Amino acid sequence: MKQMKILMIVTGTGMFPDGKQETGLWLSELAHMYDSAKKRGYDIVIASPKGGDTPVDPTSLKTMYMDKLSKEYWDDSEFRNVLRHTKSLDEVSGELFDCIYLAGGHGAMFDFPDNTVLQTLIKDHYENNKVVAAICHGVCGLLNVKLSDGQYLVKDKKVTGFSWFEEGLAGKKKAVSYTHLTLPTNSR
């Protein structure tokens, strides 16, 4: 049987646009998917828009958010090394994966939505009947994806992600105004 190959995409953005607050990947949103894929023997590739080091949101490392599995991965030097050396989306753009997974964290809000390489990767995989999945803020990477027929991928679909209400609970409404996103008018 063919080994499944999964592309996990993480943010490369470590600061909110105001330059006052750190952000990045929400660790548990990668750790749990990574662990699940690893246990199943999948070939895992981790990429970010520009490649290189993945900033991890310091809030996701706090005790109240760091579950046992996430802590195990955070303490694993091999996993941390993978996060320091992600491939760029350009490096993986010609490959076909069985699944693309967009991890969350506020950083994704700033380098996923308008990334044309990411949009093409998602379009190509979706149109080849491959799994395209996203969690939390990672769903913003789906917003501007146009399919070959010119329609937005999210048109007439239900998408669940981090809500505006939750941004308020997290105290991030001012930092994440959503006004920087180019939301397609026909995708709502």
Describe these PLM feature segments.
Residues G24-K38:
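Short catalytic helix/loop segments, enriched in acidic residues and glycine
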Residues K50-Y65:
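N-terminal beta-loop-helix "entrance" segment that forms/cooperates
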Residues E72-S93:
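Glycine-rich, highly charged phosphate/nucleotide-binding loops
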Residues C99-G104, L118-V145:
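Catalytic nucleophile loop
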Residues G107-T116:
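Glycine/threonine-rich flexible loop motifs
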Residues T179-T185:
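Conserved small/polar residues in nucleotide/adenosyl-binding loops
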